[in-house]
């Protein structure tokens, strides 16, 4: 069974990433949802830790997003998802995070 948790950033689900390209600033709005295995033995404790650790997750998303450019972030969605999954499993020392779903809107 999987429980989905939307990553929140100061009360919003939008994580804004700004890119400067050729003197112009562009933005990517990133939304992230984590899939948690409710049958994992550490689910109860880790789901609380994850919900209380949104700032840490947002920082990880921002760090990962900055590896890309404004023009490549949307096309790199699958790579971003797999990299974030590995990063967050390591950060929270858990396998209960089973998926990371990212949506990117560039402006």
Language model region names:
Residues 1-107:
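Flexible, low-complexity charged segments
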